[in-house]
Amino acid sequence: MLRLPAVLRQIRPVSRALAPHLTRAYAKDVKFGADARALMLQGVDLLADAVAVTMGPKGRTVIIEQSWGSPKVTKDGVTVAKAIDLKDKYKNIGAKLVQDVANNTNEEAGDGTTTATVLARAIAKEGFEKISKGANPVEIRRGVMLAVDAITAELKKLSKPVTTPEEIAQVATISANGDQEIGNIISDAMKKVGRKGVITVKDGKTLNDELEIIEGMKFDRGYISPYFINTAKGQKCEFQDAYVLISEKKISSVQSIVPALEIANSHRKPLVIIAEDVDGEALSTLVLNRLKVGLQVVAVKAPGFGDNRKNQLKDMAIATGGAVFGEEGLSLNVEDIQPHDFGKVGEVIVTKDDTMLLKGKGEKAQIEKRIQEIIEQLEVTTSEYEKEKLNERLAKLSDGVAVLKVGGTSDVEVNEKKDRVTDALNATRAAVEEGIVPGGGCALLRCIPALDALKPANEDQKIGIEIIKRTLKIPAMTIAKNAGVEGSLIVEKILQSSSEVGYDAMLGEFVNMVEKGIIDPTKVVRTALMDAAGVASLLSTAEAVVTEVPKEEKEPAMGGMGGMGGGMGGGMF
């Protein structure tokens, strides 16, 4: 038997041999000051150049290679930004920081990513230049943030609320790159499901864009057996004024469903059974009665899985005024069902793939309470998947769901259009939330005079304010440049005109922006500026950058290739 010190002596050489592999990470490369900033700025420039070409009504598209499938054609700033990954680590850090600006703006406002990117580049570039001449980066950042606060207040003054469907259509049209059809379809969707209703975007099956409104509760589970079909046309099962039995558990025995069938039959009501599954004797009995006696019944599997299924079934019960059998904590058995336990609906449509419960007879107060619970969950959850599911449930309980089906001749065209529709939808929601300001970069130009009233604490803060003053001209200049005209001349002319006048890049003329429908959501403009200023001014304060030195991969040895010599002779000339 070994004593402990002897065991330790044996372990020590092994630990020494392993130590380099356990403790040694990649080597690091460090750059300081102007060298580091210059390389990062090159990355910022590369990303901003690629994104800036998409800006404005005459902006161009960008083609992105994908690891699978055909290349993606897009005019969406954040999609372009996300696709960029540079080989040089220092340049990539600059690009990634501006990428974060685009992502943050997209998450918060849903649009304005291109504006945020060109603003971030302008602030970072000017900031680097002033710092290299000896200005204090921390004070410059304070000046920048001081200016941003003043502009945010000014934008609120310029903002006007969105009141009419026409204004909603105008906002959507501008964000969809001037596509009026998209603008109108989004306006219609908002009219039908309410301004806070759920609107989803999907691939269409035709050449044209379509709007489908789903009222009531629709879920993606159809009839368990085709023998339940009761219409000659359309392969579906339709009932009016039906009872709904909702069970969390599987239904297999005949005895468990006989009481429900007897009650439904005595009340002369069709019966919809929604359960985890209906099989065995229970299913064969239902099918036989349906075929021989003409029993009005249909069985459907419950949607979703796990907690999501439980929540959806509870939602259905509340919307229809029924109870959930087999629910944990409640000793409700299907055999003991009473008339008041059934959910009640005005209309039911069940197809092979989905079920729709319309005109549920649930209590308004209970439905409102359930909606409030879901809203509270939405406020605290951080998971994107959870948010999506909660929003779907919310829509089914409230005004229904509007589905925008995007049409086109090919997948590439549909995907490009889908990006624009999503942008337009997000911009419209932002406009409804915080109002609108003149578009085309004009709102930021109109905020320049507000900066003259600021009183900086020192010269370096004044430099920060001046940086923002010059940066506010960049979006309008970029839009003009993409339209093929001299940006600085256009900006000067706008500044000399009255406050409502701006440049219509599509027609190449100066117009009243709001009257012409060239408008931006206030939230989008505000978020773009705040995100750009925050990240770009931080970027300017960087004095050292640390990156990993890539490990050199050794070429694999060409072992096992011996024995090839001499055997290839004879006639090989």
UniProtKB/Swiss-Prot annotation:
Its predominant location is mitochondrion
Note the superkingdom of the native organism.
Eukaryota
Where found in the cell?
Answer: Mitochondrion matrix
Give its E.C. classification number.
5.6.1.7
One GO term describing the cellular component: early endosome
Enumerate the GO terms in the molecular function aspect. Answer: apolipoprotein A-I binding; ATP binding; ATP-dependent protein folding chaperone; cysteine-type endopeptidase activator activity; double-stranded RNA binding; high-density lipoprotein particle binding; isomerase activity; lipopolysaccharide binding
Residues that the record marks as modified (Phosphotyrosine) are 227
Q: Does the keyword Membrane apply?
A: no
What is one Gene Ontology biological process annotated in the Swiss-Prot or TrEMBL record? MyD88-dependent toll-like receptor signaling pathway
The UniProt annotation places ATP binding at 75, 111-115, 440, 520
Q: Which catalysed reactions does the entry list for this protein?
A: ATP + H2O + a folded polypeptide = ADP + phosphate + an unfolded polypeptide
The transit peptide is at 1-26
Instruction: Write down a Pfam family by its short name.
Output: Cpn60_TCP1
Asked if the record carries the keyword Phosphoprotein, the reply is yes
Tell me, in a sentence or two, what this protein's role is. Answer: Chaperonin implicated in mitochondrial protein import and macromolecular assembly. Together with Hsp10, facilitates the correct folding of imported proteins. May also prevent misfolding and promote the refolding and proper assembly of unfolded polypeptides generated under stress conditions in the mitochondrial matrix. The functional units of these chaperonins consist of heptameric rings of the large subunit Hsp60, which function as a back-to-back double ring.
- Family stated for the protein in its record: Belongs to the chaperonin (HSP60) family.
Q: What PANTHER family does the database record attribute to this sequence?
A: 60 KDA HEAT SHOCK PROTEIN, MITOCHONDRIAL
Name this polypeptide is given: 60 kDa heat shock protein, mitochondrial
